């Protein structure tokens, strides 16, 4: 119910590996995942939220700054997870895109990281933390906004237009390409016959803090019969004016916290009230953060 996380570059196993009904019908829903995230971070680890954007602790861990990346298309496209990711970024949370194949599923899902140095594990992880990624099961997709790439910040004053450049190459043809600004598709291109490579340049009006990303998909299927897709991490926009969707999306997460706390109070299984209260405290920290964002 809380969700699922993945840790990279940890020196010691973070226990417990699993709790609740995945262990047995009587195992307690304790401790919360945020505690595990803290333990991994204390070891210098990287924390990635995995294929469960609807897990109760996802918005909590994100707003409290415990996540380095957010898995999507893991193991397949699920609209609600993208919607949650978009809403989190509208709240000003910088959250790079990652992906994977899940533990028992074979697929072509991969996250690619742009690096500034010779390839190496630590440099790759640093690039992921900086948000210099795109996720894909085939197409290579690249984004440039005012000469800035994914993970970078475009700073500006007042209202203006920004130059957005997109390029792609794919072994199988893509059929749809979309520019996404603050979670809304603002420009799109359709390729009825499919496109294997190309470039696209456009001007987008911007007037507030926010983000721009690009995504593509196609009717072709990869070798595991999944529809073709790719999505970049965002380029962030910053001019000091609040993202127009911040209040609404922060309120969305406040409502989700209401439901989560109701579950903790009446459905969650705990050995004693101290455990239940400790979990409630984690959700209350998240609530305070979103209340601040909703009122800003």
Regions found by a protein language model. Give the residues of each.
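Catalytic cores of extracellular degradative/oxidative enzymes
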Residues: 1-93
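C-terminal functional module detector
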Residues: 15, 91-97, 101-296
């Amino acid at each position: 119910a809380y969700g699922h996380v993945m840790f990279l570059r940890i020196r010691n196993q973070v226990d417990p590996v699993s709790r609740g009904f995945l262990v047995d019908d009587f195992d307690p829903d304790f401790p919360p995942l945020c505690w595990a995230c803290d333990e991994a971070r204390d070891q210098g680890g990287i924390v990635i939220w995995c294929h469960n954007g609807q897990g109760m602790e996802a918005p909590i861990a994100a707003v409290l700054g415990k996540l380095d990346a957010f898995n999507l298309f893991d193991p397949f496209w699920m609209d609600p997870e993208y919607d949650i990711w978009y809403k989190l970024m509208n709240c000003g949370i910088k959250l790079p895109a990652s992906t994977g194949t899940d533990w028992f599923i074979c697929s072509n899902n991969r996250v690619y990281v742009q690096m500034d140095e010779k390839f190496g594990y630590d440099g790759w992880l640093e690039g992921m933390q900086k948000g210099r990624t795109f996720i894909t099961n085939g197409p290579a997709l690249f984004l440039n906004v005012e000469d800035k790439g994914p993970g970078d910040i475009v700073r500006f004053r007042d209202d203006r237009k920004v130059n957005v450049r997109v390029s792609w190459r794919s072994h199988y043809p893509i059929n749809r390409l979309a520019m996404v600004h603050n979670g809304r598709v603002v420009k799109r291109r359709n390729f009825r016959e499919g496109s294997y490579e190309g470039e696209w340049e456009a001007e987008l009006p911007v007037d507030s803090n926010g983000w721009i990303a690009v995504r593509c998909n196609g009717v072709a299927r990869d070798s595991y019969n999944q529809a073709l897709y790719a999505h970049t991490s965002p380029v962030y926009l910053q001019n000091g004016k609040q993202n127009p969707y911040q209040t609404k999306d922060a309120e969305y997460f406040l409502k989700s916290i209401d439901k989560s706390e109701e579950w903790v109070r009446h459905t969650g299984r705990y050995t004693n009230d101290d455990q239940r209260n400790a979990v409630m405290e984690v959700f209350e920290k998240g609530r305070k953060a979103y209340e601040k964002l909703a009122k800003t």
